[in-house]
Regions:
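FAD-binding beta-loop-beta segment adjacent to the flavin cofactor pocket
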Residues: 1-10, 61-81
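FAD-site-proximal beta/loop scaffold in flavoenzymes
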Residues: 1-30, 41
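A generic secondary-structure signal marking the coil-to-beta-strand transition
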Residues: 7-8, 55, 88
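A general structural signal for short secondary-structure boundary/capping elements
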Residues: 16-19, 43, 55-60, 103-109, ...
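Short, electropositive, low-hydrophobicity segments enriched in small/polar residues
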Residues: 17, 36, 66
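Internal hydrophobic alpha-helix adjacent to the cofactor/substrate pocket in enzyme cavities
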Residues: 28-53
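Flavin (FAD/FMN) cofactor-binding core of flavoprotein oxidoreductases
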Residues: 50-66
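C-terminal auxiliary extensions adjacent to catalytic cores
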Residues: 68-120
């Protein structure tokens, strides 16, 4: 996520061009961690870490009714690309138990990412 026209400047989240990676808080958090690790490696004269990214988005449609999308991405020749067969979307025909589980997973995801961001 280092700017091609401004070395030393890194762009993450909604301001970045991350190919198929969605504009989401989870993606931005993931990108920011990799950028921080890359900057630390540069300062220490070490190789940058291998770029691998994940994204998970949950949406609560109503009480006990959640949906999700998830994917894994990697760097390929300076671009972000999908890892083949890694993108998953909640099935359209999911039953009530599945939707309820997705709603609970979404609440757990929110608690986890909030803790990751703010509890430091």
């Amino acid at each position: 996520f280092e700017a091609r026209q401004a070395p030393g400047i890194h762009v993450v989240g909604d301001a970045s061009f991350a190919g198929p990676m969605p504009k989401s808080g989870f993606a931005a958090n993931n990108q920011g961690k990799l950028v921080a690790a890359s900057i630390a490696a540069d300062l220490l004269g070490l190789p940058r870490p291998t770029a691998s990214y994940a994204n998970t988005c949950y949406s609560l449609i109503g009480p006990g009714y959640g949906i999700s999308v998830a994917g894994v991405y990697r760097a390929d020749d300076g671009r972000v690309v999908d890892v083949p067969h890694s993108v998953g979307i909640s099935p359209l025909d999911a039953n009530a138990a599945f939707r309820d589980a997705e709603a609970r997973y979404g609440a757990s995801w929110y608690a986890a990412i909030s803790s990751d961001i703010w509890d430091r």
